[in-house]
Structure formats: structure tokens, C-alpha cells
Amino acid sequence: MTATRRLAAILAADIVGYSRLMGADEAGTVQALREHRVAADPLIAEHGGRIFKTTGDGLLIEFPSVVGAVECALVLQHLAAERNTAVPGERRMEWRIGVHLGDVLVEGDDILGDGVNIAARLEGIAEPGGVCISEDAFRQVRGKVEVGFVDLGDQNLKNIARPVRVYRVALRPRAGACPWQGTGGPHAGETPALRTIAALPLP
């Protein structure tokens, strides 16, 4: 089968501490994950996503739009937070999510290449319940989703040849926020990790 190339938005999601959860309650964890998927899969489809690979506790999803991918990430995290409300802290299922826009190789129903690998590495550095996106993805969503972003600067991701500039999604909408927090100019006195960018819809 000949592989073809295309540009795609890739979302990588993984359950935090899945091995620990399985060790504590295997049957309960499997059932809880199944319930998460039953609730999440229709939402993924609604945002144009196609799950092309599952890894037990993880998902790799292709989207035709970066906006769709990021909006889906926000919905998935909101859904997980709601489902965890009545769950003890040590039993909660939380996603880490990474989103990247990049060139990928398509072989049948599978998708391969650096575009997928970068999304997976971004997921790995996201906080529990958090979302990290690449600069390539950020350029496409700024001003189109109702959240802010924290500039984490260039990050060296495992097995990725070049540093990737990363943005953490500020999951709470920040209506009326200024484009850059801080005083004395857009970057004065700030480290990259403290630069928070508003990404509210343009009027």
C-alpha cells in the first residue's frame, strides 16, 4: 500500500496515571474508561474528528480543522471534569491532551509521521486536565476560540529533532483580557511561561 501525504490537525489524548488506576481497581477502571468513551466519542465526531488509533488508555484523532481539534479538546476536558465531580481524587480519570498541525503520512486508515509524534509529545508535557498545542496549531486558532494561551517557549520534545514552541491552553475563558498580561511592554519582565495571550473571537 502506497502512503500519501496530507496536512492534518492531530489530537493526542491519554489518561493520567492509568497504570496506577488499573492496579488499584482493574475492573472499575476499565468500566470507567468505557463510560468516558461512550460519552466522548459522539462529541469527537461532532467536531469532525476521526479516531485512527487507540492505545488502551489513549486516543489519536485526526481533524480537518485545528479549530475543531482545539474546541474538541476543550469539550473533552470539560466533560471529564464534570464526570469527576463526585469521584474521589485518587480515582479520577483526567486527560492530558496535545494538538499539532503538521504533515502526516496516510496508510489506509492509519496516520504516521512527525505530525503524529509531535502531538503525542505535546500530550506528554500537558498538565493533568490540560491541553498543550504547538505554534503551528496556535497560529490557526488565535482569535477563533474563546480561551487564552500561555506561551511556554521552545520545548525540546523527546525524539523530535528541533525544538517546538508550545502554548498551554488557559481553559477558563478570559473575556475582556488584554493581548498580553504584564506592564512595561508586551514582554517586559516576563519569562515565556508567563506570557498569556488572549485568543478571543475577533469582532
Tell me what each language-model feature is:
Residues 25, 55, 101-103, 201-203:
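Short, histidine-centered active-site or binding-site loop motifs used for metal coordination
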Residues 9-11, 16, 100, 165, ...:
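Protein kinase-like catalytic core scaffold
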Residues 2-5, 10, 54, 90-94, ...:
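A generic fold-level signal
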Residues 181-203:
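Acidic, proline/glycine-rich low-complexity intrinsically disordered segments
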